[in-house]
Amino acid sequence: MRSAIIKEGPERAANRSLLKATGVTDSEMKKPFIAVVNSWNEIVPGHIHLDKLAEAVKAGIRNAGGVPFEFHTIGVCDGLAMGHEGMKYSLPSREVIEDTIELMVRAHQFDGMVLIPTCDKIVPGHLMAAGRLDIPAIVVTGGPMLPGYVDDKYTDLISVFEGVGAYSAGKLSEAELKRLENLSCAGAGSCAGMFTANTMACMTEALGLSLPGCATAHAVDAKKVRIAKESGERIVALVKENLTPRKIVTQKSFENAIMVDMAVGGSTNTTLHLPALAHEFGLELPLKTFDELSRTTPHLISLRPGGPNFMLHFDRAGGVEAVVQRLASKLHLDQLTVNGKTIGENLDELEIVNPKLNAEIITTLENPIHAEGGIAVLKGSLAPDGSVVKQAAVDPKMRVHTGPAKVYDCEEDAMKSILAGDVKPGDIVVIRYEGPKGGPGMREMLAATAAIGGMGLLESVALITDGRFSGGTRGPCIGHVSPEASEGGPIGLVKDGDLIEINIPERILNLKVTEEELEKRKAAFVPPKKEVTGYLARYQRSVHSANTGGIVD
């Protein structure tokens, strides 16, 4: 056991003495030491229940003959950080989480670890630590929140964000907005649609790093507690088998995950997190792989924000495994998972308990919702290194569009203008200097896109940014434009009124300005300098472009 280095032999008497100070007995010294890495806190709805899941995990570890030791990581709520400087700290927190897990696990020589994250950057941070450390590990994602129910329809956090835009446009009363505010977020769990947190939970299961059914089992469901307990039991077996993440996750595993991503219409943030995760596993995952697999993998289930169904419906219809079942002819079924079985072997044991709902909301390869997957990668004179759009959530009328640019150098300026009614049908809103370095921190533009949506403009207005979007964003919203403005990317050269061409079927994003004019602008271009201090200053110096996953040196 790895932990032998801190607990065996006369020379380790002092180490054992410290362990005994925590209550460890001599008999426990002979058992595997398991880290329970918990991102519980009291301000993030997706994390307020993780203390209970950690207790279940620890019970499972003890049942199987291990000794659990719990420690905590940070966790940022993107919803609470949205629309102000706090969002600059969200993406950077991913690497902080990964680094702190490495520090704790390496310093204390744990034999294995159970990782308990829920929300947007916390799940990838935990996964990246699993790839970097490569000790036996299993992930228990915290599970979705139940949807709200207002005015005889299901609602979620995005309903509230869009309600703000509707209120500003005079389409919603203050009392109606208050009702949405009070009733749309029903309690513990990640926001109730196929937004970033739930997309990453699905990616975790598709990669084989969590037990079957974990991704969609809801935060308040007893099934989640049982999965947590079973995960605690399983980690002890993983230690004995020396089955580590790099023996489970391969290039083919990432291809499987991307195909599932395309089928469920997942968040564009996967194009940041999966390449960064692959990097920690010693693999490469370029943007072109996403687009190649999108062209051959159909979109099979219409989930919020691009459709009517919530994670609750998806879970009842069979969850990730039900989609894997539909995609079986395309997937690498020989890939291993943390339960020791291959994806194909897990499928053999799959029971669909609600066959009617399964058939109603998860379509087939022969009759999909869309022939292509949920995400498209666009390139052109405005994005030479690429950009991404959730094409599954774009109105057909806006899949091909050319319009005049309305340019803003930060999200706050754009929001004021949108809410003031300055943005008109046909316009293309450009928000720049919001990339990984330029922000710094690559903020999400959900407040802006939700305001546009709430004002009824998503069928006529597009938004382009070198920042990124929430998984809750819908409409013709193109993000991760690379190179970013602060690095001299063409998005920094756009002026008000310039025509921009968007062609999603052809994967084109062009600035309709002559080469001669662009060269003139480039010669005079000086990106604004932002004074940043503390962690953001270190992050700005070391972060890489969005098209490579925004990894940090």
Curated annotation (Swiss-Prot):
Binding site for [2Fe-2S] cluster: 119, 191
Keyword Iron: yes
Positions of Mg(2+) binding: 78, 120-121, 444
E.C. no: 4.2.1.9
Lineage: Archaea, Methanobacteriati, Methanobacteriota, Stenosarchaea group, Methanomicrobia
UniProt keyword Metal-binding, yes or no: yes
Protein function: Functions in the biosynthesis of branched-chain amino acids. Catalyzes the dehydration of (2R,3R)-2,3-dihydroxy-3-methylpentanoate (2,3-dihydroxy-3-methylvalerate) into 2-oxo-3-methylpentanoate (2-oxo-3-methylvalerate) and of (2R)-2,3-dihydroxy-3-methylbutanoate (2,3-dihydroxyisovalerate) into 2-oxo-3-methylbutanoate (2-oxoisovalerate), the penultimate precursor to L-isoleucine and L-valine, respectively.
Cofactor or coenzyme needed: [2Fe-2S] cluster; Mg(2+)
GO cellular component: cytosol
Gene: ilvD1
Coiled-coil zones: none
Protein name: Dihydroxy-acid dehydratase 1
Keyword terms: 2Fe-2S, Amino-acid biosynthesis, Branched-chain amino acid biosynthesis, Iron, Iron-sulfur, Lyase, Magnesium, Metal-binding
